[in-house]
């Protein structure tokens, strides 16, 4: 049990690394003071361009994926795999390095989900791409894909603890998008420009 506790704590710390903030700072920008003020990949992309935005997306995704893969490699049971994945995600959303104020968690959740159920991610990703291609709203695609993810995991994995973890993550992602939801309702949400 000691190994499981250690990896869960490490996953939270790894998840807490503010990838977007660090990459933006390396470019001479405080990402919290530009655009939406969010440290996630979408704001970094809009502010600093494709290269830094994609690097942020990949870094945030890896923060969720790597701890889950390590937990699986070490043979952790589902409760601990779920704990490690949730810890990495919570680290990103409530980072210790920024006073427990982090990103919205979409990319880190993607990494966790890739480690838990890659086939489920394909369904959610197809949904995300379809919505963004149709509406040009990344936030709407993220919200709907997050809401659908527990259903995909339930259908593919049929493992209650992993479904439960996915549901908790999905709810937090949606709650973190409450301002986006308000702007979508008001018609003031920014559309994605390739």
Curated annotation (Swiss-Prot):
Lipid bilayer topology = Multi-pass membrane protein
Membrane-spanning residues: 4-24, 80-100, 112-132, 137-157, 161-181
Q: Which Pfam families match?
A: G3P_acyltransf
Please, which domain of life does this record's source organism belong to? Bacteria
InterPro entries, per the entry: G3P_acylTferase_PlsY (IPR003811)
**Enzyme Commission (EC) number:** 2.3.1.275
A GO molecular-function annotation:
acyl-phosphate glycerol-3-phosphate acyltransferase activity
Q: Which GO terms describe its cellular component?
A: plasma membrane
This protein's pathway reads: Lipid metabolism; phospholipid metabolism
Q: Which reaction does it catalyse?
A: an acyl phosphate + sn-glycerol 3-phosphate = a 1-acyl-sn-glycero-3-phosphate + phosphate
Asked if Cell inner membrane is a keyword of the record, the answer is: yes
The entry's keywords: Cell inner membrane, Cell membrane, Lipid biosynthesis, Lipid metabolism, Membrane, Phospholipid biosynthesis, Phospholipid metabolism, Transferase, Transmembrane, Transmembrane helix
Q: Does the keyword Ligase apply?
A: no
Protein task? Catalyzes the transfer of an acyl group from acyl-phosphate (acyl-PO(4)) to glycerol-3-phosphate (G3P) to form lysophosphatidic acid (LPA). This enzyme utilizes acyl-phosphate as fatty acyl donor, but not acyl-CoA or acyl-ACP.
Q: Which NCBIfam families match?
A: glycerol-3-phosphate 1-O-acyltransferase PlsY
Q: What is this protein called?
A: Glycerol-3-phosphate acyltransferase
């Amino acid at each position: 049990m000691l190994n499981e506790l250690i990896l869960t704590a490490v996953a939270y710390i790894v998840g807490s690394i503010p990838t977007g903030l660090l990459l933006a700072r390396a470019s001479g920008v405080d990402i919290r003071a530009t655009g939406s003020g969010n440290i996630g990949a979408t704001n970094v992309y809009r502010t600093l361009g494709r290269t830094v935005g994609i690097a942020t997306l990949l870094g945030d995704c890896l923060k969720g994926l790597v701890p889950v893969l390590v937990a699986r490699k070490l043979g952790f049971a589902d409760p601990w795999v779920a704990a490690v994945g949730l810890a990495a995600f919570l680290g990103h959303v409530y980072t210790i390095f920024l006073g427990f104020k982090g990103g919205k968690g979409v990319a880190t959740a993607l990494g966790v989900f890739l480690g838990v159920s890659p086939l489920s991610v394909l369904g959610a990703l197809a949904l995300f791409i379809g919505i963004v291609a149709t509406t040009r709203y990344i936030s709407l695609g993220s919200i709907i894909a997050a809401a659908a993810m527990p259903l995909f995991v339930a259908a593919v994995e049929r493992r209650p603890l992993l479904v439960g973890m996915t549901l908790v993550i999905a709810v937090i992602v949606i709650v973190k998008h409450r301002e986006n939801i308000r702007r979508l309702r008001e018609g003031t949400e920014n559309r994605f420009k390739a």
